[in-house]
Amino acid sequence: MKSKVIKKVAAVSLSALMICSLSACGGSGKKEVEKTEVDVNYADIKVGEDYTDIEADLKFLTHKTDMVDTKFQEYIEEFQKLYPNVNIEYEGITDYANDITTRLTTGDWGDICMVPVTVDKDELSNYFTSFGNQGDLAKVYENDMLNSYAYDKEVYGIPSMANVQGIVYNKAVFAKAGITELPKTPDEFIEALKQIKEKTDAIPLYTNFSAGWTMTAWDAYIDGGATGDANFVNTGLTKGANPFSDRKDGTGPYAVYSTLYNAVKEGLTEEDPTTTDWEGSKGMLNRGEIGCMALGSWAVTQVQAAGDNADDIGYMTFPITVDGKQYAAAGPDYCYGINCNSSEDEQVAAMCYIKWLAEKSGFAQSEGGLSIVIGDEYPEALAALDGVELVVNQPAEPGEENLFQDINNDSELGINVSGAIPTQIVEETTSGTMTLEDMVNEWNEKWTAAQEANGVTAE
C-alpha cells in the first residue's frame, strides 16, 4: 500500500458477528462430507490465462445482500469473458453472522463464502481450502492483512478488502458549525459536536443504536488506533490488568468509550436512540441532517451514493492523539473462503474468481476500502488520512491463537462481536442508573474473571 506507514496490531476487526466459536456452537456435529484435496497454488494462477477452459457451477454465500442483483451480476459478466464456462450464483444472507455458522456445519453449503470469525484457527482446514503458504501470498498481498485466517503458515481466507476505522462526517455541516480543523482528541471532538448543535440543525452524532451491529464500530477504535501499540490486543487486552480503566492521558479503551458516553450524556446524539434507522441515516448524513457517524471506511461510498451531495462526505480518524501522533486501526474485512468439500474443478474455478475479485475487479476501491494488493493506491475518500499511521493486525503467539476470542466470549463483553459495551453505554446513559465508572468497574471485573478462567494472570 502506498503513502502510509503501516504497523502491526492484534487480530480482531470485523463488525457484528456471533460471540460463540463454531466448535462451541456445534461444530462437532459437522456432516461428514468427503474432503477434496487440490494440488493448485493460488499464488501462481495467472487470471485470464490459466484454467480458462475449466467448467464449474459455483454458489457464493454473501452478506452483501444489496449487491446480489446489481454489482455482483456485473462482476459475473466480466469474469465470464475470461472464464465462459464458470457459472456463479450469489446467495445473499440477511443474518449472515448467525446463519453462516450453522450452514458451515452441513459441509455442503456452497463453494465460496465470507469466512466467519466463529471458526477457530485450528479448525480452518476442516472447512476451507488452503490458498497456500503465507510467505508466497505475501509477495502479492499485504502480509499483515493475511493473518486473520492463517494457521501453521497456511492461509484459508483472502480479504475482500481492508477497512480503516474512523468517523464518516459531513464537511458542509462541519464548515457551517465553524469547525476549521478536524478534532484530534476526545475533548476537541465533544467541543465540535457542541458547535454543530449550537450552530446548525443537524444531529451532531448519530449512533445508529437500533441496528445493533453498528455499535461494534466503537469497539474497533480501542486497540491500535487508541493506543499506537502494535500489540495491544495480545498484551493490553488479552493479558492486561483492568484494560478498561482510565489511563488519564486521553488514550486507550476508556478514552473511546467515554467519548460515546459524554456525547450521549450531553445531548449530542439523536433524541431517542431506539428510533434510529440505519438505511435512512445514510441519506440524512448525505443531506446534512447528521454531522457524523462512527463507521468503518466501507461506509463512505454508501453515504456518498445516498443523495446528491457526495462531495460533502469525508472521513477522519477517531479523535485520539498518542504522544502527539494520530493512529488509525486498519484490518481486513470479510475474507473469501473456499469449501474444501467442493469438487476439484469447483475449487480451482473458485480460486480464479477470488483472485479476479481481489486483483482485477476494483471492488475494494469502489466500496471505500483499501485494496490488499501491494502498491495499489488508496481511494480518494480516504485522502484525509494522509499522515495518519495505520495499525494493522498482528497475530497472537503460537498456541494462543484463540485466547483473545475465548476471553472475549467468556466475559460476554463481545468486543468487535456484539457491541455489548457501547450498547450498554447508550442504554444506561439514556434510561439507566449506572455511571460510567460503574460500567468500567463491571467490564474490568468480567474481563478479569474471564482471564482467570482461561489461565491468564493479568500483567
Predicted regions and their residues:
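Extracytoplasmic "Venus flytrap"/periplasmic binding protein-like
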Residues: 78-144, 156, 172-184, 284, ...
